C-alpha cells in the first residue's frame, strides 16, 4: 500500500469514527430500541418522560464511551495520555471550578443579547426539561443524567473527536468549528437560542481542552454548570434553555 493510500484509509477510518461518535447515530439506535420495547418518550399528558430520558442518556453514554475506548485501543492510543495529559488533577479540578462562573456569565450574557437582538430565536418559550423536575426522584434522575451524559460523556466525546480531526481531518480548529455546530444542533429541542449558546459553550470547552490537553477542567466546569442550571430552574430564577 502506498503512503497516499495509507493516508486516505486513515482519513476515511477517522471520519467513520467521528460520525459514529458524534452522538446522533447512537442516540437514534437507542430511540429505535426503546420504541421496539414499547417505552414512550412522553407520558399520558404529553410531557417528556424522565424514565425515557434517563434510559436514553445512560444507554447512549455507555455505548459511546465503549466505542471511543475501542477505537483508541485499535490504534494503540493511550486514553490516559489523551484525556488527562500531564497536568496535575488538583490544579485542573480547581481550574474547572473557577471556570464555572465564567461559563454562567457567558450563558446569561449571550441569552440576554440574543433575546434582545433576535427575539424570534426563542422559539421554545420554556425549556421542555423543566417539566421533568417535579419530584425529588425526578430531580435525582435528571441530575444524574446531566452529570454522566452531559458533563462526563460530552467532554470525553469532544476530546476524542477533536483528536481525530487534529490527526487526520484537517486540523483541530476545523474539528472545533464543526463539532461545536453539531453540539449546538443537538440541543435544538430547547430552542434555537439555546442551540446557539450551546454551540458557543462547546467551542469554549473545546478550546480549553486543546490548550490544556486535559478533560478534567472541562468535565468539572461542564458538570458544575449543569448542576447550577438545574438549581436555578428549581428556584425559578432561570427559564432559559441550557
Where does each model-flagged region fall?
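Hydrophobic core segments of transmembrane alpha-helices in multi-pass, intramembrane catalytic enzymes
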Residues: 59-64, 145, 197-205
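Membrane-helix interface segments
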Residues: 11, 77-78, 88-93, 138-139, ...
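Membrane-interface helix/loop boundary segments of multi-pass membrane proteins
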Residues: 152-178, 207-214
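N-terminal, membrane-interfacial amphipathic/helix-forming hydrophobic leader that caps
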Residues: 1-81, 90-91, 116-117, 230-242
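Hydrophobic alpha-helical transmembrane segments
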Residues: 13-17, 53-54, 93-98, 139-143, ...
